[in-house]
UniProtKB/Swiss-Prot annotation:
It is found in: Cytoplasm. Single strand-specific metallo-endoribonuclease involved in late-stage 70S ribosome quality control and in maturation of the 3' terminus of the 16S rRNA. HAMAP family: Endoribonucl_YbeY. It comes from Rickettsia prowazekii (strain Madrid E). This is Endoribonuclease YbeY.
Amino acid sequence: MINVEIIRNYNKWREHRKINKGLIKKITQNVLVRFDNFSKIKQFELSILLTNTAEILTLNQQFRSIEKATNVLSFPNNELNWHNLYSKLEFLYYSDYMHLGDIAFCYEVIYNESCEQQKTFENHFIHMLIHSILHLIGFDHQNDTDANIMESLEIEILSYFGIPSPY
């Protein structure tokens, strides 16, 4: 079971009814099911903030010391490393609950990127959601090898939902 809490701090998000708890749960489940280590956990929790440029800028300054708005910020609740997701992680077997973390999405940046990249807002949001969930479970793109692995997973998951590769 995946419990999703959504906070909408910007009304433009309400125009996109497809972006809801059901979609977020479905995407999250599709990411997690790829890793056997998560199979013993009965309940996951994920917090989503749907916000605007001003708030994402504040968050990016506060937590990353970057003076720029961004499309999405991920705040993992656990210190996971994707390299370990394919081997047995003992700590995951001691609990049947896991709070994955928090994700903040910026409407204006996602909207502008979707227009520039000629894709639907919803499809771009889904890509950013997959990307951010992968960050929550320990993936990153700090070097080319890790970026290629993360992007390959994103492409695979997007294709499951009928969305073409963004790369």
